[in-house]
């Protein structure tokens, strides 16, 4: 994920991060708080569980899954924003695990691209301080709602998969029927980012009732097979496949990236 990334030249400013990047850094801040609380009382089991839950739930099951398309299929600011976020997380995480996984953490540190002032040995680094990436309660509440919506979409996609309507989730086009509050919440995220959040090819927002009822008040979800053809590079379905003569099996976005 960090292949070719140089933190000295490639890091982007905070205002260039996507909201999900800010969410990931806020989750890191919570980890820093919990790990420090464990270390302060020599409760290493608490540190272990905090690190484990962060890596499995916040990162592997969510953030890394959602950002795959941005990392592998695009160039530019979006990709660098994800890499900037992952680099900050990896540096902080390595410092957190150093007291209890000293050899593993040093092996990671040896491979990390360094910035000026970083020590040769991770055990000489100060622990990351809480508050640097903290998010306010409104932001956390917003993303708790977005994740709840995502969970409801996943249920409908599983049903569509069972009914042989789709195979992989990227074969799906999802319509979200919303009341005003849910519509405003979802519409605050760019549609391409919302589709990435759901890991589908297309998302449409509709005010009103429809689709399958969900546990999120004011939300109905419907899934269908996405129109268009499958891009061989990003696996998303698009009507722009073949629009670039030199790359007849790629969507317009991927063709432009390959040509760049």
Annotate each language-model stretch with its function:
Residues 2-36, 64-156, 160-184, 203-221, ...:
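Acidic, turn-prone loop/beta-hairpin segments
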Residues 39-46:
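Short helix-adjacent coil turns
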Residues 227-230, 247:
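Short metal-coordination and nucleic-acid-contact micro-motifs, chiefly zinc-binding Cys/His arrays
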Residues 231, 251-254:
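Short cysteine-rich clusters marking metal-coordination/redox-active sites
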Residues 237-240, 257:
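Cys/His-rich metal-chelating microdomains
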Residues 240-249:
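Short linker/helix segments within small regulatory modules
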């Amino acid at each position: 994920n960090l292949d070719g990334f140089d933190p000295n030249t490639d890091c982007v400013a905070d205002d260039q991060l996507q909201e999900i990047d800010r969410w990931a850094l806020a989750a890191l801040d919570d980890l820093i708080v919990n790990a420090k609380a464990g270390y302060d009382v020599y409760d290493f089991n608490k540190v272990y569980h905090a690190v484990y839950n962060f890596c499995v739930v916040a990162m592997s099951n969510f953030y890394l899954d959602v950002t795959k398309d941005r990392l592998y299929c695009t160039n530019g600011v979006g990709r660098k924003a994800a890499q900037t976020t992952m680099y900050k997380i990896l540096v902080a995480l390595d410092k957190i695990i150093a007291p209890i996984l000293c050899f593993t953490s040093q092996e990671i540190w040896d491979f990390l691209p360094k910035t000026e002032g970083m020590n040769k040995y991770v055990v000489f680094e100060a622990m990351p301080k809480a508050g640097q990436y903290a998010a306010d309660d409104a932001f956390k509440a917003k993303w708790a709602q977005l994740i709840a919506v995502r969970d409801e979409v996943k249920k409908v996609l599983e049903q569509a998969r069972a009914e042989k309507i789709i195979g992989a989730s990227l074969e799906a086009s999802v319509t979200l029927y919303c009341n005003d509050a849910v519509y405003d919440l979802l519409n605050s995220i760019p549609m391409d980012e919302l589709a990435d959040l759901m890991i589908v090819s297309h998302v449409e927002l509709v005010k009103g009732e429809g689709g399958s009822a969900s546990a999120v008040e004011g939300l109905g979800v419907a899934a269908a097979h996405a129109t268009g053809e499958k891009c061989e590079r990003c696996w998303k379905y698009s009507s722009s496949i073949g629009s670039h003569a030199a790359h007849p099996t790629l969507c317009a976005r991927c063709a432009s990236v390959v040509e760049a």
